[in-house]
Swiss-Prot record:
GO molecular function per UniProt: acyl-[acyl-carrier-protein]-UDP-N-acetylglucosamine O-acyltransferase activity
Protein name (database record): Acyl-[acyl-carrier-protein]--UDP-N-acetylglucosamine O-acyltransferase
Self-association and partners: Homotrimer.
Gene3D superfamilies: Hexapeptide repeat proteins, Udp N-acetylglucosamine O-acyltransferase, C-terminal domain
Species classification: Bacteria, Pseudomonadati, Pseudomonadota, Alphaproteobacteria, Hyphomicrobiales
A single cellular component GO annotation: cytoplasm
Principal place of residence: cytoplasm
Keyword Transferase attached: yes
GO aspect biological process, one term: lipid A biosynthetic process
Length: 271
């Protein structure tokens, strides 16, 4: 049985299915639908015409705008109605028309969105995506299934990300780009096909990365992408030189990690 706290404000036109968990100070505006397995954190706000379905958790103080559909079944031909989940962290904002799907059994069953994220209008997060914190998805961004995105990454409007692609921490994807391969932490990718275009120096500076550190990351980037040789071999060759630079080590670890996709590079073709 659903217990609605006295502090919650729910418009009489909205439907709250029996079994839903409503936190303190939750606001649910007109014509929303909250499914029976949905959990809404304290202080969350749903403006109007929001559909919350599936086995979905929305964190504290998150705001979801009209016509968003959160926790829908995965758009996968392999899905046969199994119960899978979606978890969204605290302080997230999902603007008009955002869609986020639950996971699939094949993908582990869980779609996860971290905290303090901003998803702008009509952006889509497909099944089994794993997103960190402080991420911005601009209008009409499309994430295919199983995509992984690190903290503080920014994706420009209309960009599309291929399934199983990894996007590293604080990377920047330009508007209308086609991101088909993994993007290193702090990398910038633009175009269709998407090509690596250097480092997100502006983002690094805003995040408080020291100028000397940025210089070292630039030096490592040149060694990785301007010199001849296989990328993994080059990553191994420079590891000792940059052992004291956490940002470079993060990039090197990303390069050698297991992945279903190749690595984005500054030139056409796979790296």
């Amino acid at each position: 049985m659903t217990v609605i706290p006295a502090s919650a404000r729910i418009h009489p036109s909205s439907v709250i299915e029996d079994g839903a968990v409503i936190g303190e100070n939750v606001t649910i505006g007109p014509f929303c639908h909250v499914g029976s397995k949905v959990v809404l954190g304290d202080g969350a706000e749903f403006l109007s015409h929001v559909v919350l379905t599936g086995k979905t958790v929305v964190g504290k103080n998150s705001r979801i705008f009209p016509n968003a559909v959160i926790g829908g079944e995965p758009q996968s031909i392999h899905h046969s109605g199994e119960e899978t989940t979606l978890t969204i962290g605290d302080n997230c904002t999902m603007r008009e028309g955002v869609t986020i799907n639950c996971g699939t059994v094949e993908g582990g069953g869980h779609t996860v969105v971290g905290s303090n994220n901003l998803f702008l209008a009509n952006s889509h997060v497909a099944h089994d995506c794993q997103l960190g914190n402080h991420i911005i998805l601009s209008n009409n961004v499309m994430l295919a299934g199983h995509v992984k995105i690190g903290d503080r990454a920014i994706l420009g409007g209309g960009s599309a990300v291929h399934q199983f692609t990894r996007i590293g921490r604080q990377a920047f994807i330009g508007g209308l780009s086609a991101c088909s391969y993994d993007v290193i932490p702090y990398g910038m990718l633009n175009g269709n096909p998407g090509l690596l275009g250097g480092l997100n120096v502006v983002g690094m500076t805003r995040a408080g990365v020291e100028r000397a550190t940025i210089h070292r990351v630039r030096k490592a980037y040149k060694a990785l992408f301007d010199e001849e040789g296989a990328i993994r071999e080059k990553a191994a060759a420079i590891r000792e030189e940059f052992a004291d630079c956490a940002e470079v080590i993060e990039i090197l670890d990303f390069i050698v990690a297991e992945s279903d996709r190749a690595l984005s590079s500054p030139f056409r073709g796979k790296s």
